[in-house]
């Protein structure tokens, strides 16, 4: 191989509006203590009515491109992961975001892998770069999850937040600046555990069509149990495959869904406090944006430096899951 795929830059963005747990008490049977005890979440950010996922994503994307010392014209491909796209089916959020960046006549498409979306993005970008098809790939996890939440459902609406994270994936000849390994998987037999139904209305041809609300639905207990079991196995597998141990990893950056899930994996692998990046308490579950947001925050705080090895893992609707070993090439 002449070169490897490398994570050249990282940036994140969150909306300005903070929503604390206590605010849910105004319309739900819940409390700050109840939410924090079960999830580790203290607050989250919600976008304004005017903002869309692409608006959040473009801010992170501009900064990621700048940090990679590139311009939008240098980007060969744009891929966005989101469960809260700007439009229901088309155009893709990647196309909308590309236009806002001034990128024309370059391919752009979305990935639908829910909370595992960023791991899937890494897999796609790595393949495009290492095949020689692209030199610079922009990947973005952008979510306005508040647009798909049922604020009468205590089991879901307290968990999620809005935000975006973006990376530029380029080339390197150094293995220890590369995306070392990515593994992704799915099992559609559990698709009814976590899903967002389409809005259906009666038509002249099907007057009995069932009316559904397009809100995120989740079987919380079942998802929790499967997530812990699956992630433990997946993380052990990628470390063993690459002859690495937890102590070889500089930062463990899991999907920020629930503190209890993160803690279960952390304790099983005996990660130290300084190895683990946590943002769930501040931002909640931002789905496909959570890992790049956590990476971006670690970078801005000086915890993530060039050459550092990161272990990433995620689990989401589909059901989908995946993990990655990534050296920071920036």
UniProtKB/Swiss-Prot annotation:
Q: Does the keyword Nuclease apply?
A: no
Q: Per the record's keyword annotation, is GTP-binding included, yes or no?
A: no
Q: Which molecular-function annotation in GO is an example for this chain?
A: beta-ketoacyl-acyl-carrier-protein synthase III activity
Q: What is its EC number?
A: 2.3.1.180
Any Pfam family from its record, for instance, is ACP_syn_III_C
Main localization (coarse):
cytoplasm
Q: Identify the CDD domains for this entry.
A: KAS_III
What keywords does the record list, in alphabetical order?
Acyltransferase, Cytoplasm, Fatty acid biosynthesis, Fatty acid metabolism, Lipid biosynthesis, Lipid metabolism, Multifunctional enzyme, Transferase
What pathway is it annotated to?
Answer: Lipid metabolism; fatty acid biosynthesis
The catalytic activity, as recorded, is:
malonyl-[ACP] + acetyl-CoA + H(+) = 3-oxobutanoyl-[ACP] + CO2 + CoA
Q: What class of enzyme is it?
A: transferase
InterPro entries attached here?
Answer: ACP_syn_III_C, ACP_syn_III_N, FabH, Thiolase-like
Q: Which GO terms describe its cellular component?
A: cytoplasm
UniProt note: domains: The last Arg residue of the ACP-binding site is essential for the weak association between ACP/AcpP and FabH.
Record-linked NCBIfam families? fabH, PRK09352.1
Q: What does this protein do?
A: Catalyzes the condensation reaction of fatty acid synthesis by the addition to an acyl acceptor of two carbons from malonyl-ACP. Catalyzes the first condensation reaction which initiates fatty acid synthesis and may therefore play a role in governing the total rate of fatty acid production. Possesses both acetoacetyl-ACP synthase and acetyl transacylase activities. Its substrate specificity determines the biosynthesis of branched-chain and/or straight-chain of fatty acids.
For this entry, the protein name equals: Beta-ketoacyl-[acyl-carrier-protein] synthase III
The species this protein belongs to is: Helicobacter pylori (strain G27)
């Amino acid at each position: 191989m002449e070169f490897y795929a490398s994570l050249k830059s990282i940036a994140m963005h969150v909306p300005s509006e903070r929503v604390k747990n206590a605010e849910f008490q105004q319309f739900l049977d819940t409390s700050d203590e109840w939410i924090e005890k079960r999830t580790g979440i203290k607050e989250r950010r919600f976008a304004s009515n005017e903002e869309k996922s692409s608006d959040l994503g473009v801010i992170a994307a501009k900064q990621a491109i700048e940090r990679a010392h590139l311009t939008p014209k240098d980007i060969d491909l744009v891929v966005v992961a989101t469960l809260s796209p700007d439009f229901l089916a088309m155009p893709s959020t990647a196309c909308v975001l590309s236009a806002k960046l001034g990128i024309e006549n370059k391919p752009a498409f979305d990935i639908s892998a829910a909370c595992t979306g960023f791991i899937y993005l890494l897999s796609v970008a790595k393949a495009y770069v290492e095949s020689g098809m692209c030199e610079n790939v922009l990947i973005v996890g952008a979510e306005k999850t508040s647009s798909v939440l049922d604020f009468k459902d205590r089991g879901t609406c307290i968990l999620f937040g809005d935000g975006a994270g973006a990376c530029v994936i380029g080339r390197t000849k150094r293995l220890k600046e590369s995306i070392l390994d990515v593994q992704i998987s799915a099992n559609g037999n559990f698709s009814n555990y976590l899903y967002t139904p389409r809005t259906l209305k009666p038509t002249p041809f099907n007057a009995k069509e069932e009316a559904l609300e397009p809100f995120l639905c989740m079987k919380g207990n079942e998802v929790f149990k499967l997530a812990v079991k699956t992630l433990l196995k997946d993380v052990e597998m990628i470390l063993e495959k690459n002859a690495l141990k937890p102590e070889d990893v500089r930062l463990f950056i899991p999907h920020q869904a629930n503190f209890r899930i993160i803690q279960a994996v952390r304790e099983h692998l005996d990660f130290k406090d300084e190895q683990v990046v946590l943002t769930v308490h501040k931002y909640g579950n931002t789905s496909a944006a959570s890992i790049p947001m956590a990476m971006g925050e670690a970078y801005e705080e000086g915890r993530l430096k060039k050459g550092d090895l990161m272990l990433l893992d995620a689990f989401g609707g589909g059901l989908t899951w995946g993990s990655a070993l990534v050296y920071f090439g920036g």
